[in-house]
Amino acid sequence: MKQPRTLVLSIGLLASMPVMASDIAGGQSPAQDGVHYINAGESTLNAGPHRSGRAGISLGPYANAARVDVASLAPYATTVVRGATTVRTLGPDAGLPFATAGVGYFSFVQVGNADVWFGEWSSSGAHADFNHRQVFFVGDRAGTSLPAGIVTYTLAGINRFDGSGVLEGALRANLDTGTVTAGLVGTGYRLAASGTLDRATGAFSGSAIANGSIIGTSSGQFFGAGASAVTGIATFAGNSQFDTSFGGQRN
């Protein structure tokens, strides 16, 4: 049974200053084997509707491990609207312009209109208990800058998405004092995380705790001018059912 969830994230920021990086940033939870896995980063495939140099995802050894830009997958996905969040779901029957055997099942969300995405992948989908599931985030951090003062974000989160709902919450960052707190609210599930920001890149990493005792890690990235978007993941080795991806726009 799919459980509702609550995520609380507390991130210590080292400083507030412009981020001059112009490349793609991303991350994913650990793979469960050497065949069924994804990898987030800069897209490398330049064929058909696919373009290199964008936020991308690869499927293990599939297509020689070339990363496909997520934006080119979006038109083939089915959209599921839950509140203010549009989740795109995509499986082997999506009609992609390349062989679909082994593609698995994606649920992913675009943050605003930017080339910034978060979601999850599994080899079997919700109908078969999300085998080999991984969560991910990826986006273009060109022109990212971190402002002074307080910024807030409306968040959504993905965890074993079966079409019924997404996590909802908010993030508040006081960039004068260097602290960020966030929460994704559900029922019966608690996640807490803390970390620090690399001011040169806009990336953060740290620890996470599920249900008060299960220890994991958190990582993520601020994107855009004025830190207009944020995405990240919380992961738990040996307890991947708690792995969650999240993201949102600055209010």
Task: Please tell me what each predicted stretch does.
Residues 1-8:
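Bacterial N-terminal signal peptides that target proteins for export
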Residues 16-18:
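N-terminal signal peptide c-region/cleavage motif recognized by signal peptidases
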Residues 21-251:
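Mature soluble binding/inhibitory domains
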